A protein has these predicted regions:
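Flexible, low-complexity linker and terminal segments
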Residues: 110-196
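Thiamine diphosphate
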Residues: 1-113, 118-120, 139-143, 155-156
């Protein structure tokens, strides 16, 4: 799910163009907060999900983002903020790297489009291992670059959505999706960052 804005729009457009053949659900959301909520819902149902937004959108989604980092994820969830250093096509600059530090979640910063593909794949795997969202940060020059990317094998299995919510309250796999007490979650987040 995503919200349009340079330099992030092309990602959702590209995913939408292959959505039928790859069995992907892709949407333009009402705003960035809704996009993050839609992606989180997919993750809570044990599906991989991607939230695409520009730097201003991270601020729009920040209320939910703060809770999401505290409650954790189930299926791999990558949040892909596309930033515009120097405000080449935006009215201001933003830097989502501060959210990674504040929320104590992993941040990956690719330097070219092959790394962007590889790190996004790794971001999903890391998210599934750590049970938290992973930021994969892009910038204008990367978002608007083009070239050859080696995909490798694409997944062929069809994952089915499943949602459990009747387990132990602090069990991230079967319990309700809630933010646990801050002190408890803060310690867990620090362990996840060390593990990453």
């Amino acid at each position: 799910a995503g919200y349009p804005g340079t330099p992030s729009s092309e990602i959702v457009e590209s995913l939408a163009s292959v959505s039928k053949e790859r069995n992907l659900y892709v949407e333009w959301s009402t705003n960035e907060k809704v996009a993050m909520e839609v992606a989180a819902a997919g993750s809570f149902a044990n599906l991989r999900s991607l939230c695409v937004l520009k730097q201003n959108g991270v601020n729009v989604a920040s209320d939910f983002f703060l809770h999401l980092a505290g409650s954790g994820t189930r299926g791999g969830m990558v949040i892909l903020p596309c930033e515009d250093p120097g405000a080449l096509s935006s009215v201001n600059e933003g830097d989502s790297r501060h959210f990674s530090r504040m929320l104590e979640i992993p941040l990956l910063e690719p330097g070219d489009f092959q790394e962007a593909k590889d790190m996004t794949k790794w971001g999903f795997e890391l998210s599934e291992t750590l049970k938290c969202p992973v930021l994969v940060r892009s910038v204008t020059r990367l978002s608007h670059a083009s070239g050859t990317v080696t995909f490798g094998d694409l997944p062929t299995t069809e994952q089915q959505a499943t949602f459990k919510h009747d387990g132990f309250v602090l069990d991230p796999e079967t319990g309700p999706v809630i933010s646990a007490p801050v002190n408890y979650k803060h310690g867990l987040q620090q362990q996840k960052v060390q593990q990453a």
